[in-house]
């Protein structure tokens, strides 16, 4: 009703329900009601990993729609000639960007951005191309409209209602201290509230089994700690010897942060064999946890930012005779792998890269999520956990985060906490 009410009054809005509450179905219901009024084609722009899911959901809930979900340039070229014949066109962000010259010749009834954090950087090509699309109505679907800073919201509203939050320079200046100023947080919340609909699982599905979150700490092995301290000291020396405004200095900082995170995960991730043979306390902890959960008949989703880390785990799993599924950004038959895991009780484990597997997948056959390495953005981790804690889940869900003591990972947790405070207040 929110979408119907607001679009009838020509307001562009954000549907920001928590993950797993049916944003896709709500949007399709709106489009179905508009089809009766003879609307022009609607355009869905989403991550490439979700285009097939959108097509499946459309076939299920609006089978009367003529839907185009082209996978490559040849297929896209074929639909431009007959675009007005379609009710719904589904493009990835990359495809929409590459098709800019064609899309500018069409006016859509709706342009819908799914997982709209893809336009949170106002200077990105994704943002520029999406904002150039012509449509009678614009809608954003995202459970995480604010991930890193208030500027995420500015960019989304620059797509929805250009000028509503002023220009970017003025916005930055006015909300410069929003992290520490509750009055500014409340001010921004009041400005955007009429255009945002957000429901939580507790509001919509009180019978949904609970999700229990737990952080499990481990200490580095002595040899691992020595390597960590050596890389940290090397980074400090490089920083002291460089100029503050030197681009190479910034690059060195990011490289050091990456190396420290890699050592926490597994020293073998370091380049040039620097950590070869150095044990990983966290990998040992992971294997213990997996065996405990498998012995209790739990199905587990294991997420890591590093696909190379997942690759390191595979030999250990194969040696133990543990069957598993695997998915990262390069996986083509995503849905087949998801269905295989969900439908086969003999497969207790799914290895997923955090970015590729964290959105758009329904994995309610699992009841345990393990975040192997904490990420700077807490919203990304929450999305990963919600692959299983969603409508259709019948068991309590455990979400475990593995953290190395006295390391950069504890600093990441502190940053996550500050970001979450801003999100909750706004």
Predicted regions and their residues:
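ASCE P-loop NTPase motor core, strongest for the SF2 helicase catalytic module
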Residues: 1-183, 189-426
